[in-house]
Amino acid sequence: MNGSPYSSSSWVKSSLSTNSLGSLSNSYAAGSAGGSGNRSTVRGDSNKDQKLLGYLQKQSKSQLPNSNVKIFKKKWFWFESDSGTLFYSATSTGALSTPLTPSSLSENIKSIKITSQTTIEQSISFRLELIIKDKVPNDEFTVLNWVNTLNQWKKLNCNLDFTNDTTTTTNNSNNSNSNNNNKQYNSIENPDYLGKFGEVEGLLNAMSVSTSLNTMKTVKPLINKIQNDSEQLKLVLSQVEQQIEFLKSCQLELISHLSNDNNNNNNNNNNNNNILQILQQQQPISSKRTVSNDNLVGSNNSNNQLSLSIGLPINLNTSNTTTTTITNNTIEGENDDDEEEDEINQTSDIFSLLPTHLTLYVFSYLEPKELLILAQVSSQWQKLAGDNLLWVRFVTHFITPASIFDKSHNWKSVYLANTVTSLGYCSNYYYLKNQQKGGICTNKEKYMNRAISMYGVTPLTSLSSSKEGWLYKRGDDLLRIWKKRYFVLRDSSLFYFKHQNDNFPCGVILLNHGTKLKRASASTRKNCFKILQSKNSTITMVHKKRMPYYLSTDKEDDCNDWMILLNSIIKSNTQHQNNYGVITISGTSNNNNNNVYINNNNNNNNNNNNNNNNNNNNNNNNGSQSYNLPPLLSKSPSFSNALTSSTGISGGGGGSTKSRKSHKKSFSSGGGGSGGNNNFEQMQQQIQSVHLTPIYPMFGVALSKILENQSLITTQTHLKIPFILYICLNYIISKGIKEEGIFRVSGSLREVQELQEHFEQGREIDLDQHDIHAICGLVKTFFRKLPHTLVAADLDEYSTSVQLAASQTEDEKIQEFKFIFESISENSFHIFELLLYCLRLIVRNESFNKMTIENLLIVIMPTLKCSPVLITNGIKYYDEIFIKK
């Protein structure tokens, strides 16, 4: 340390520890306790030459990040009794026998001054630790006095320095300081500044802050002078009222402008001038916010943005399209395009002059229709309304949904009618789907059909792809270079494009009945599989040897998803048949034992109905509890009929066992005395009169595609949710509600994959022969592989905001959650209706299954891909949300 030992920074707190200091520190501790003959202990006047010295552990100011652990550093300490100062340095230079002074050390020396304000005490938590600290103020008044005085001094000096740099007037050097200060204060012009200092200004001029600080005199607190509640609140209130009046006047101006334009175009300019004169008289804002006549007259020109904002109230309830456009073809005297754009921008920027929080606050109390008008006119709200999250942005500033200001929920209907919705969650989606069914085909589909026509394959029947994504394809040339291509799977054809938006495909891979799919070796490339085609690569029976297609993905899960989907397409592909499906044969012989059938006919299957009734009676006798279905699904056929009337999936097992036995006997008996040719002819007749059950992929496909394929099956047309969910969830409701660890215990992966293949291939399934946990795993797998979420992102975020809204009552929150569920797509609504009903029954039986609502959320939320707030409140308020009174 250079200079005086007191030049170090003042100590607030210094902690010294004698722990693990060796013999010297131990003797120091003993000497301080009253031991005799120790050189580090001062005893009376006779030992003035002796000093306290030794190594101590000093607490460092630095600490480990995110930790409260104390860090101690070893320092050499000695005490000078003459000056009352405790010195310390890094080392003692090895001289322990002679007393050390600050001048005898070459290292930096720091000091601790012992004064009357210093407190020295033993640590309470650790006995081998002493604490030296200065006296700190023990009252809040002193702290506020210092804080307020210093802040005000800083603010005034900063303002004075700024005005000295920017002022253009020159003052005489002989003027007094008071005149200079007055000129500087008068040069500040800020119309939005909340009042001038008044008494505070004079008080600070008369007071010498530097003198007060040097003499350490107590300064009277200025908090009462600065924050005068009554005067400041009146000033703020007057400014807010002025802004509200100005906004209302601008709004009335725009509405009257439209009405005058529609009624009488000739008198339009006169009306605007009258309104402008009224506004200029009532406008309480400075000249920076005034609006000129040219700007308002220029707004008469046709502009999509302005006309849309003004025309929203007219077409508010009658518009079914996504956006509304109004064009004014009768406006005369149009100006140039450049002038028009400038004038419109200046008019819309009027609202952007307000602070963001004040704009939001004022707009929140407007009517729904007026809110949308100002949302289009204001440049601030254009940013918020552009991403379809207008009501969610309310929550960011208010912690309360905007719809709470509108008890009649008109604001929500206005929002849904005029917002730009995403594909899959709007009413226009079904309109587009109906148009596609009517035969509207884009250029991309035409080129795809043209690409596969050279192979002799029938054109594409669907306009939507089963799966799309980027894959790496190995080239067919000699170098075998891997190239990234965009693959599109349509029906049984796999197209690949160079770019995602290209219309012309680079090639096509046909997935016919002779195609094989295998996993490539790890030495080729990671996450790689190959597609092998037979020699008969075309239907024209032209023999052509084809090299395998090698495809690769970035992730292992994507590779497995592609392979599972392609395998299902290959197995279900029947290009040589008229329809997709599995052949089901119903015998025509009089002998019932020789029937061969996987029957889908509901009229000629009396034995199966009797067996199912017996199975239901047996299940009830075994003590299994039955539950009523939700109101919507209870209108559908019963659970047992749905199991037997669909693709042969049975909940019991009695009737299905007999059918399998008769199926085996029919092929082993040889026809019961009839000739082989007669049996062959009989089989041909049965095949010709076969009833086909369509097969389609159910996993990794959009809900709309699944339900579209499901509508082709007569026994499943009444279902409003995917068939696999209807069967599995109803089976869980009837058999697995009280199963311990339901949805938590993992089922066999092989059994889950087997169930998946059976459902997609339309095989006969006896759910009683499978583990209930495997069925739950199948349900979770279905939700996990959905390519989209069940709830839109804005609605999902809005549900969290409703949950956090502290100003809403419970009934208001229920209405908000009901609105959220009603705003999602119809398919997702029905899925949630059955799923939440099942989860509610599980929670009610938590004493048996040990599954509380917290445990359910842990295992089910990663698969549903939505906010847990929706699931929790959907279970809690199920009757109020889904049951219509």
Swiss-Prot record:
Query: Where along the sequence do coiled-coil regions lie?
Result: 222-249
Molecular function in Gene Ontology: GTPase activator activity
Q: Where is this region: Disordered?
A: 168-187, 594-680
* Gene3D superfamilies with a match to the protein in the record: 1.20.1280.50, Pleckstrin-homology domain (PH domain)/Phosphotyrosine-binding domain (PTB) (2.30.29.30), Rho GTPase activation protein (1.10.555.10)
What are the protein's UniProt keywords?
A: Coiled coil, Cytoplasm, GTPase activation
What subcellular locations does the record give? Cytoplasm
The answer to whether keyword Coiled coil applies is yes
Q: Where is the composition biased (Low complexity)?
A: 168-182, 594-622, 629-648
Broad class of the protein's primary localization: cytoplasm
One Pfam family named in its UniProt record? RhoGAP
Q: InterPro entries, per this entry?
A: F-box-like_dom_sf, F-box_dom, PH-like_dom_sf, PH_domain, Rho-GAP, Rho_GTPase_activation_prot, RhoGAP_dom
Q: What induces it?
A: Up-regulated by Pseudomonas aeruginosa, PAO1 strain and PA14 strain infection.
**Ranges for the PH domain?**
464-571
Give the site residues for Arginine finger: 744
Q: Name one GO biological process term.
A: small GTPase-mediated signal transduction
| Domain Rho-GAP: residue ranges | 701-885
Its Gene Ontology cellular component terms are:
cytoplasm; plasma membrane
Q: Which residues form the F-box domain?
A: 348-394
Q: What does this protein do?
A: Rho GTPase-activating protein involved in the signal transduction pathway.
Protein known as = Rho GTPase-activating protein gacFF
Q: Which organism is it from?
A: Dictyostelium discoideum (Social amoeba)
Q: What is the lineage of its organism?
A: Eukaryota, Amoebozoa, Evosea, Eumycetozoa, Dictyostelia
